[in-house]
A protein has these predicted regions:
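Short beta-strands within extracellular/lumenal beta-sheet-rich domains
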Residues: 3-17, 58-59
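Extended extracellular/luminal ectodomain segments enriched in beta-structured repeat modules
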Residues: 15-22, 70-72
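Extracellular carbohydrate recognition and processing domains
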Residues: 40-71
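Exposed low-complexity, polar/acidic, P/S/T/G-rich flexible segments that act as propeptides
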Residues: 82-101
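Beta-strand-rich N-terminal accessory domains
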Residues: 99-166, 371, 378-392
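Beta-strand-rich recognition/accessory modules
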Residues: 102-114, 121, 298-396
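Extended, loop-rich substrate-binding clefts of extracytoplasmic carbohydrate-active enzymes
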Residues: 161-229, 243-247
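Acidic (Asp/Glu-rich), glycine- and aromatic
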Residues: 219, 230-273
Length: 396
């Protein structure tokens, strides 16, 4: 069938109870869709987006999945084009099912080294990382999770021009900023889907727009989390369906928050990467917006050793390595040395890559995380420095 700017209604009439639906389809252009369903005597409608492609699959939980909501029947769906092109669309199948709720809030997975928490109610960002070999008494969760902005999570920056309506944060006008966890008002992003296998946790969400207090974005974020010995490996994917023209911006890849206790920031500032040269350290980092130059770390030409870490005075801490970046911003907010993951104080790292978001075209990248003594962190990243390249950015 041909889909245009006008809604095309497709009757479903599936009368079995469900909290998850799955489409198999082929579409020549992206589509904006709705699902109408019955729930406790009421008709409800929720929105979803389909990427263009052949023999594609889209799966989504119902809006109330984490609250154990179950719909009574799938009545119909609508589809319309987002771009100016008509779409040739084939719905191969539309199925519904009732699946268990993985967790109402945090889903945990672990190996012999780490226990990791995925915050399902906050878009599937990482809210918990416990190192089972941590030598520091009282340090359990190394990550800060004070609010929806404080996770290890995806965060992107786009347009500030009409028709987009700017938001506001800390007294500043704020551009389009899809954030995995939610928005500045602590509204939660919607969990779209999640899957758990023996070695991997997959999550997908529809993020909020950070500068707005409520509302959502026309975008999806996906993560694949894998524990591999002493490493946490994270793959990321983002697709924007807004149709807006975005300028090039420094994208946080990812936004990364630890507890305040890890007070020393280490990085390699030389020009002979992976040669075990002397590391640089700053132990007095301020809140990053208060002094951008002091909190900005630009690698020298040819330096591919772009990991960094926050560690305590004994050298223990947490490191992050995102290859093929432009520079890194790091800082400490309300530094007080707290080990409390819920504290207002925190440390922050954001490797930045200058990328112009292109609607309907996926952004993909990966990074590594490891905990331990500083020399162990460095050695582990060196051992796997060629495993991730993030060269997809170069052709985006």
């Amino acid at each position: 069938m041909q889909i245009t700017k006008n809604d095309t209604v497709i009757s479903l009439n599936l009368t079995e109870a469900f909290n998850r639906y799955v489409l198999s389809y082929t579409a020549t252009t992206p589509l904006r869709c709705t699902l109408t369903y019955a729930e406790q005597g009421h008709e409800r409608v929720e929105e979803f987006f389909l990427e263009a492609g052949e023999d594609m699959t889209f799966a989504s939980y119902m809006d109330g999945y984490l609250r154990h909501m179950v719909a009574d029947a799938a009545l119909s769906m609508t589809a319309r084009t987002i771009t100016h092109e008509a779409c040739e669309f084939t719905l191969h199948s539309f199925t519904v099912e009732t699946v268990p709720v993985l967790a109402e809030k945090t889903f945990y997975f672990e190996n012999e080294r780490y226990r990791v928490g995925v915050e399902l109610c906050w878009g599937g960002g990482l809210s918990y990382l416990e190192d089972k070999k941590c030598p520091v008494e009282g340090l359990v969760n190394i990550l800060n999770n004070f609010d929806t902005g404080r996770l290890i999570q995806q965060s992107y920056y786009g347009t500030g021009d009409p028709p987009y309506v700017r938001g506001e944060f800390m007294g500043n006008s704020w551009v389009y900023n899809p954030v995995q966890g939610g928005d500045r008002g602590n509204h939660k992003s919607k969990l779209i889907d999640a899957r758990v296998s023996e070695n991997e946790v997959y999550v997908k969400c529809r993020p909020r727009d950070w500068g707005h207090d409520g509302g959502t974005t026309y975008s999806y974020m996906e993560n694949w989390y894998r524990l591999d010995g002493d490493y946490l490996v994270v793959d990321n994917r983002f697709v924007d369906f807004s149709g807006w023209n975005h300028p090039k911006n420094g994208q946080e890849v990812p936004a990364f928050y630890t507890v305040s206790y890890l007070n020393n920031y280490y990085w390699y500032d030389g020009d002979q990467p992976w040669s075990d040269g002397e590391l640089s350290v700053k132990s007095d980092l301020p809140f990053w917006p208060d002094d951008w130059p002091y909190c900005t770390f630009k690698p020298k030409a040819g330096n591919t050793e772009t990991w960094s870490a926050f560690v305590d005075d004994g050298g223990y801490g947490l490191g992050l390595f995102t290859p093929n970046i432009g520079h890194t911003i790091a800082g400490r907010h309300m530094y007080d040395g707290s080990k409390d993951p819920h504290a207002a104080s925190c440390n922050y790292i954001a490797p930045l890559k200058a990328v112009k978001l292109q609607c309907y075209k996926p952004v993909t990248y990966s990074y590594l995380i490891t905990a331990g003594q500083l020399e162990e962190i460095r050695a582990r990243f060196k051992a796997r420095k060629d495993d991730i390249t993030n060269t997809a950015w170069d052709n985006y």
